[in-house]
Design a protein with these regions (language model features):
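Conserved alpha/beta enzyme-core scaffold
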Residues: 1-269
């Protein structure tokens, strides 16, 4: 394969031919610690590109750069996501957008992309480690964020794919969540995220007594079911109660000597 490393986000945006009205996507695994979305949008704004459809896997309460500002200045005029938190969510509720916002579940979003209902012109995939050929992961590095699963469909289906990392490693990057065959360009920036904030917000560990009570009762229900047996599988999440429930469930698994075949979800946590 070819070396795909470019010198800056500006070079990448120009190389992919991003134009007014196109659709861009991101993943939200860096959660409140994300510093990629702001950098990319600032680059796009500086190049005078406007009226973009902003289609991330979800929007959390991003603190470093307000998405609201990019809507107000016309850089973004449409939003499609799987959920919107924080200042952008508040602004949408109070009439920020002229076009209705489209929200899909985490399962419906990949289906819409695969079916062509949501066509991604450019996917910017943040990675905690990547090599110059485009192999990328979120599992290692100072800003590890877990699986890059939210970006799989973007990598497979987007017209252009740019991997953004602050941790360039020797080829081959391993384990690779995103394979080089799906990547057009790689950009190294100074910083992609704040590791102290990746586990904040919805992905925080909870100490709230009510949350813990709900989590423990949910674990009790699972443990009392006929499905709680050797090689069972379960789906969890990155939410505070889900994390606590998984912890309680682990205690019950150890006590009864039960092992799961696999667990799905909650990768960021």
């Amino acid at each position: 394969g070819d070396n795909k490393l470019l010198g800056s986000l500006k070079e990448a945006v120009q190389a992919i031919g991003l134009k007014d009205g196109m659709t861009i996507s991101f993943h939200h695994s860096f959660r409140e610690g994300d510093e990629i979305i702001g950098q990319v949008l600032e680059t796009i704004r500086d190049l005078g590109i406007k009226h973009l459809r902003f289609a991330p896997s979800a929007v959390v309460n991003i603190k470093n750069s307000s998405i609201v500002d990019f809507v107000k200045d016309g850089t973004i005029d449409r939003i499609e996501a799987s959920g919107i938190r924080g200042s952008l969510g508040d602004a949408v509720l109070t009439g920020l957008m002229d076009e209705p916002v489209i929200l899909r579940t985490h399962g419906a979003r990949p289906r819409a992309i695969e079916a062509g209902e949501l066509e991604i012109d450019a996917a910017f995939i943040g990675a905690s480690a990547a090599d110059e050929y485009g192999n990328a992961t979120g599992q290692i590095g100072p800003n590890a964020c877990g699986s890059l699963g939210y970006s799989f469909i973007d990598a497979y289906c987007a017209s252009k794919v740019v991997v953004v990392t602050d941790n360039l490693v020797e080829y081959p990057c391993c384990p690779a969540s995103i394979s080089q065959q799906y990547v057009d360009y790689v950009v190294k920036v100074d910083r992609i995220g704040d590791p102290e904030k990746i586990g904040k917000g919805a992905a925080r560990m909870t100490k709230n007594p009510r949350d813990l009570m709900i989590a423990e009762r949910a674990a009790d229900v699972i443990a009392a079911s006929r499905m709680f047996k050797e090689n069972f599988s379960f789906q969890t999440g990155a939410g505070a109660i889900s994390i606590a429930c998984t912890n309680y469930l682990a205690e019950r698994m150890e006590k009864r000597g039960v092992k799961a075949s696999f667990a799905l979800g909650g990768m960021t946590a």
